[in-house]
């Protein structure tokens, strides 16, 4: 069924995710550095299924940290006007400049944001602002792992942004290594 792929994702996070001080969840072993192609395909299919009603024609992502869901292209020197925003990533602990060429994004585009993590929502907020500035329509955001105990998800949803997170971590304990996912007890 549709849940299988995401159960696999949660199992992988439980098995291979490392909890570090300061609410950091390391999933480099399968999300960032060593891409698990099967898992990525499952993730891609799930996003496609969830946003099937939305006629997405553009996908915007930030510093795809090795994420194969949205293919990363080499940065070219962009001629002409660009949209730009600075965002601070909680997950990666640094500030990014996001630059999108105006010829890439505009009226009539239906844009889906994709990111590996949603923590405090700064990165996605920056991307959402670019979409808004361009006159394109923001269809929503597809997140692989949302930290439900941080403010990002609630903030973005409160702004009316459709956020689809494949795994929502409600709590994680550095000492015991325990990760609790939303909906663990009940299937929503």
Regions found by a protein language model. Name each.
Residues 1-56:
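Active-site-facing substrate-recognition patch
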Residues 12, 16, 128-188:
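PRPP-dependent phosphoribosyltransferase catalytic core
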Residues 42-91:
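Conserved PRPP/pyrophosphate-binding segment of the phosphoribosyltransferase/PRPP-pathway fold
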Residues 45-47, 69, 97-100, 126-130:
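A generic local structural motif
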Residues 52-57, 105-109, 113:
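Short helix-loop-beta connector
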Residues 58-61, 113, 139-143:
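Short catalytic-loop micro-motif centered on adjacent basic/acidic residues
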Residues 74-111, 177-187:
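Short, glycine/charge-rich flexible loops or terminal/linker lids adjacent to PRPP-binding catalytic cores
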Residues 117-124:
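Acidic, divalent-metal-coordinating active-site segment for phosphoryl/phosphodiester hydrolysis
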